[in-house]
C-alpha cells in the first residue's frame, strides 16, 4: 500500500468524513478536499441548489467529475459524498488511486448528527429521515464495504481518536 499516497474517506452522511478528513490531513501534512465543497466551489452554488436545479442525476454527474479530477492528485485526503459510491467509475477511481477508508456509523448516530442540517437534500423529503437513512444504508453499505481497504467505526469517538486509529493502520 505504500505507493497509495491518497486517502479517500467514504461512508454515509453523518459519519464524520469531513471532520475526520481534516484531522488526518493536518496530522499527515496532506492537502484536504471535500467533494461537496469542491462542487459548490465549481458551480458557485450550494448542493441543495444543484439538487433542485439538476436533480440527483445531475448532481451525481458533477460529483463523479469532481472525484475523478481530485483523485488524480497525489498526497491528498478526500472526503467523498455519501452517495458517490453508487457510481462504478467513482468506485474504480478511488480503489485504483488511493487507500479507501470506510467510516462506519449506526443509523442512530446518523439521525443525531444530521437532524438539524438543512443542507442535506436527500433528507429534505416527506419521508422520515430515519427511513431515508435506512434505505440508503441497504443500498450503499455493501458498496462501501466492497471497496474499503480500512473500515473504522466512528460512533462514540472523537474525530481525533478516529483519525489516530486510521493513521495507525496506514502503510505510509
From Swiss-Prot:
Q: Which cofactor does it need?
A: Mg(2+)
Q: Which NCBIfam families match?
A: PRK05057.1
Q: Identify the metabolic or biological route this protein is part of.
A: Metabolic intermediate biosynthesis; chorismate biosynthesis; chorismate from D-erythrose 4-phosphate and phosphoenolpyruvate: step 5/7
Which residues constitute the signal peptide according to the record? Answer: none
What GO MF annotations does this protein's record show?
ATP binding; magnesium ion binding; shikimate kinase activity
| Job description of the protein | Catalyzes the specific phosphorylation of the 3-hydroxyl group of shikimic acid using ATP as a cosubstrate.
What is the top EC class of this enzyme, as a single word? transferase
Lineage, top-rank taxon, reads Bacteria
> Which organism encodes this protein?
Colwellia psychrerythraea (strain 34H / ATCC BAA-681) (Vibrio psychroerythus)
Query: In the Enzyme Commission scheme, what number(s) does this protein have?
Result: 2.7.1.71
Please give the CDD domains that the UniProt record associates with this protein.
SK (cd00464)
- Does the entry feature the keyword NADP, yes or no? no
Task: Specify the protein name.
Answer: Shikimate kinase
Q: Which reaction is the catalytic activity of this chain?
A: shikimate + ATP = 3-phosphoshikimate + ADP + H(+)
Localization terms from the record: Cytoplasm
Amino acid at each position: 500500500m505504500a505507493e497509495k499516497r491518497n486517502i479517500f474517506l467514504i461512508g454515509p452522511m453523518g459519519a464524520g468524513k469531513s471532520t475526520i478528513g481534516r484531522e488526518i490531513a493536518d496530522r499527515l501534512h496532506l492537502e484536504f478536499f471535500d467533494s461537496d465543497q469542491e462542487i459548490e466551489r465549481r458551480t458557485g452554488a450550494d448542493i441543495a441548489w444543484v439538487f433542485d436545479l439538476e436533480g440527483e442525476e445531475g448532481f451525481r454527474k458533477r460529483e463523479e467529475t469532481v472525484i475523478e479530477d481530485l483523485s488524480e492528485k497525489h498526497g491528498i485526503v478526500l472526503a467523498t459524498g455519501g452517495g458517490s459510491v453508487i457510481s462504478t467509475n467513482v468506485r474504480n477511481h478511488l480503489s485504483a488511486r488511493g487507500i479507501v477508508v470506510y467510516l462506519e456509523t449506526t443509523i442512530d448516530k446518523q439521525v443525531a448528527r444530521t437532524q438539524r442540517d438543512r443542507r442535506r437534500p436527500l433528507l429534505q423529503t416527506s419521508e422520515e429521515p430515519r427511513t431515508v437513512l435506512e434505505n440508503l444504508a441497504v443500498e450503499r453499505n455493501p458498496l462501501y464495504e466492497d471497496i474499503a481497504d480500512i473500515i473504522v467505526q466512528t460512533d462514540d469517538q472523537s474525530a481525533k481518536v478516529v483519525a489516530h486509529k486510521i493513521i495507525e493502520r496506514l502503510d505510509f
